[in-house]
């Protein structure tokens, strides 16, 4: 899964790609071709 700052190009990679919001993050999921998965946003872990 790729971590991207913008999902604008990721959502147009394949006709089956969908955008889903889960737990404050934005995901691109693609069941027919899972290599197009991507995520944007979320919280950062503290060290």
UniProtKB/Swiss-Prot annotation:
Example GO molecular function: structural constituent of ribosome
Protein family: Belongs to the bacterial ribosomal protein bL36 family.
Keywords: Ribonucleoprotein, Ribosomal protein
Organism: Yersinia pestis
GO biological process: translation
A Pfam match: Ribosomal_L36
GO cellular component term of the entry, any: ribonucleoprotein complex
Gene: rpmJ2
Ribosomal protein found in the keyword field: yes
UniProt-recorded name of the protein: Large ribosomal subunit protein bL36B
Keyword Iron-sulfur: no
InterPro entries membership: Ribosomal_bL36, Ribosomal_bL36_sp, Ribosomal_L36_bact
